[in-house]
Amino acid sequence: MEKKKTSSGCLPGKPCFPWVGGKRRLLPVLIQSLPENITEMKTYVEPFVGGGALFFWLRQTYPHIRCVINDSNESLVNVYRVIRDTPEELVGLLAGIQGEYHTLEERTERRDYFMEKRRVFNEEHPDDITRAALFIFFMRTCYNGIYSVNRKGRLSVTFGTGSRARILEEELIRCNHKLLQDVIILDGDYRQTEKYAGEKSFFYFDPPYKPVNEAGTCTSYMPDDFDDDCQIELAGFCKDLGGKGSK
């Protein structure tokens, strides 16, 4: 069955990789919670973009709204920038990685390939396009799609089931390339998005989760945990945005 395309002539945009905590399945609920006057809004800001499920939906549905996305995970943000600026180079690298990976018959061979790519990512300081390709590869082949780094900030994702996962979605990358044009892409502290606050702007926050126990796997999203004090500071930040008229 042919997949339905949007008015822009491409497949509906969505994240190019699995992302723990992503909101694709919750989109109907989030959409119902958008401001009633959304058509009058001029700026949408997502300070913790992650996989960007709501961002991609909104970008296609309300293309007149300026979008600002940010994340403290520079490696993640780099993927968005590469898709926006050099999609064909990214497609070429992913095709090569997928071809190499799928020729490996044994799980141990695929694990060794995964670990070597992780070493390259951590130790050889590859260029931005290569880093983006490796990031997508890791997220499609690592254990449960869980991104993790150690306390030194080195990537520590673990190998998954070893199946021949689909690594390259060429048409999706090209669609997202179109959607990311003119999007302001930031990396760093969420507070830097405050300058986009105003009566015609609205913010969507999906910060890192507090783990349900001390062994929670998602605490390793970044080297520094987003603890209770950070959550309290974020609540104050949201209050300040409301004082400036933002939704």
Residue spans of the language-model regions?
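SAM-dependent nucleic-acid methyltransferase catalytic core
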Residues: 2-34, 38-39, 86-219, 233, ...
